[in-house]
């Protein structure tokens, strides 16, 4: 029995590595459709509730940049169940549109936040005209894009001149002690806890692989600048376990 469990775990990890390498849009969609019922619960549990703080931090910075804008238009991409979109919607006068490729995640988002417009779609082909938004945000979703460069160019395209991209992603700490502790939790503890509550433990094997492969700090700001943004900065949060990128068109 133990051998069968070990084999299943090994197969799940290999599949996760394979998905991280291919980033098939259809596979990513299926994965998020599967985890949708337990997504919010596990997000808050596995981050110890700190994910809400990260969203609030991003929204606070966005609010300051939009002080002179009485009716900002905001697009939240890879919105999932809509938590970052809802946070951004608390900015005075903001009109928020949110987009995701998972129908199951969107069904939950619409029930939670009926005041927000939710659309099905994907980052590499945003269904909006040029210069439509003051802010484009994405919380914990950019590393799942099938084509990261194309997605960032689309962010740039739909932003108004002077507009901002706000992107939150997990970060692997640069401090060696924190890095070791983080990776032990991420690779060994997190998938096991997730497996107790989610039908798709595969998704939580994929998570650490996707974070490790994602270009971090200056590597990602270089991609943002290459995509047309005139400035791109990063702000590590909570002992460098998460990072906020802000880029201006």
State where each predicted segment sits:
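Core SAM-dependent methyltransferase catalytic element
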Residues: 221, 227-249
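A short acidic, Gly/Pro-enriched loop at the edge of an enzyme's catalytic core
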Residues: 124-135
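N-terminal auxiliary segments of SAM/dcSAM-dependent transferases
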Residues: 2-30
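Conserved alpha-helix/loop element of class I SAM-dependent methyltransferases that forms part
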Residues: 48-71
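Class I SAM-dependent methyltransferase SAM/SAH-binding core
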Residues: 73-126
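A short glycine-rich, Lys/Arg-flanked "PGG" loop and its adjoining helix->strand segment in the class I
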Residues: 149-161
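C-terminal alpha-helical "lid/dimerization" subdomain adjacent to the S-adenosyl-L-methionine
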Residues: 26-27, 101, 168-223, 227, ...
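Hydrophobic beta-strand segment of the Class I
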Residues: 39, 136-137
């Amino acid at each position: 029995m133990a051998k069968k469990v070990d084999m299943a775990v090994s197969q799940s990890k290999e599949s996760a590595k394979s998905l991280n390498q291919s980033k098939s849009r259809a596979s990513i969609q299926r994965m998020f459709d599967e985890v949708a019922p337990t997504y919010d619960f596990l997000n808050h549990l596995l981050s110890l509730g700190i994910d809400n703080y990260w969203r609030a931090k991003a929204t606070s910075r966005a609010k300051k940049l939009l002080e002179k804008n009485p009716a900002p238009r905001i697009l939240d991409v890879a919105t999932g169940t809509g938590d970052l979109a809802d946070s951004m919607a608390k900015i005075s006068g903001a009109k928020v549109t949110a987009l995701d490729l998972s129908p199951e995640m969107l069904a939950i988002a619409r029930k939670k936040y009926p005041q927000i417009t939710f659309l099905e779609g994907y980052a590499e082909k945003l269904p909006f005209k040029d210069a439509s938004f003051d802010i484009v945000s994405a919380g914990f979703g950019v590393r799942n894009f099938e084509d990261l460069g194309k997605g960032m160019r689309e962010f740039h395209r739909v932003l108004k001149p002077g507009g901002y991209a706000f992107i939150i992603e997990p970060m692997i700490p640069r401090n060696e002690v924190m890095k070791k502790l983080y990776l032990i939790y991420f690779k060994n503890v997190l998938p096991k806890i997730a497996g107790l509550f989610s039908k798709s433990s595969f998704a939580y094997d994929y998570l650490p692989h996707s974070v490790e492969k994602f270009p971090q700090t200056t590597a990602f700001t270089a991609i943002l600048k290459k995509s047309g943004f005139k400035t791109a900065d990063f702000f590590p949060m909570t002992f460098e376990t998460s990072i906020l990128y802000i880029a201006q068109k």
